[in-house]
Curated annotation (Swiss-Prot):
One Pfam short name: UPRTase
UniProt cofactor(s): Mg(2+)
Magnesium found in the keyword field: yes
Listed name of the protein: Uracil phosphoribosyltransferase
Cofactor detail note: Binds 1 Mg(2+) ion per subunit. The magnesium is bound as Mg-PRPP.
Binding residues for uracil: 193, 198-200
Pathway: Pyrimidine metabolism; UMP biosynthesis via salvage pathway; UMP from uracil: step 1/1
A GO molecular function held by the record: magnesium ion binding
EC number of the protein: 2.4.2.9
Top-rank taxon, per record: Bacteria
Enzyme class, spelled out: transferase
Keywords: Allosteric enzyme, Glycosyltransferase, GTP-binding, Magnesium, Nucleotide-binding, Transferase
Catalytic activity: UMP + diphosphate = 5-phospho-alpha-D-ribose 1-diphosphate + uracil
């Protein structure tokens, strides 16, 4: 599995702001979108292009466009919605697939409860977004669902990742590319990332 920790100064600055204990819902939500946008830029740099002819202002001209079907964005509910618009800023025609998974607070195991994938996901690049990769359970379950639907091109965008989650994800799906702003230190006894961002879902939706 290829893991890219994006060290761009803008991303590192913004992640630092998100770690503040008293950050407002508005600010946290804004930065989650911004970092999602910046990670998308990095994660799509190797998309295949093709030459097409269009009608320009003074006649026919050859231009470069992304080849084949465009991507589908796959936010993991609910926190993944906070990064979705950042992806769509760069790929506004991308289709949206949704997967709902919550983590059982006692067992820390993922519990799927909803999925709605685009019908031709097997022809698209799936960009899976979730702010936190902690134990990796929710992400693994999501990738399982996407692959079962026939998708073979998958990249993962997370704001912060724990080493334990990355290890588990690699064991389950070694063919992935993962882009993150930070690989943090460890998980605590409750399965939260340290230093982490706190509960990203609560902070994005104002339910903290």
């Amino acid at each position: 599995m290829k893991v890219i920790e994006v060290k761009h100064p803008l991303i590192q600055h913004k992640i630092g702001l998100m770690r503040e204990a008293d950050i407002s819902t508005k600010r946290f939500r804004e930065i989650a979108r911004e970092v999602g946008s910046l990670l998308t830029y990095e994660a799509t740099k190797n998309l295949e292009l093709e030459t097409v002819k269009i009608q320009g202002w003074n006649g026919e001209v050859e231009v470069q466009q992304i080849k084949g079907k465009k991507a589908t964005v796959v936010p993991i509910l609910r926190a993944g919605l906070g990064m979705m618009d950042g992806v769509l800023e760069h790929m506004p025609s991308a289709k949206i697939s949704v997967v709902g998974i919550y983590r059982d607070e006692k067992t820390l195991e993922p519990v799927p409860y909803f999925q709605k994938l685009v019908s031709n996901i097997d022809e698209r690049l799936a960009i899976v977004v979730d702010p936190m990769l902690a134990t990796g359970g929710s992400m693994i379950s999501t990738i399982d669902l996407i692959k079962k639907a026939g998708c073979t091109r998958i990249v993962v965008l997370v704001l912060v990742a724990a080493p334990e989650g990355l290890k588990a994800l690699e064991a389950a799906h070694p063919d992935l590319e993962v882009y993150t702003a930070s690989i943090d230190d460890h998980l605590d006894e409750q399965g939260y990332i340290v230093p982490g961002l706190g509960d990203a879902g609560d902070k994005i939706f104002g339910t903290k």
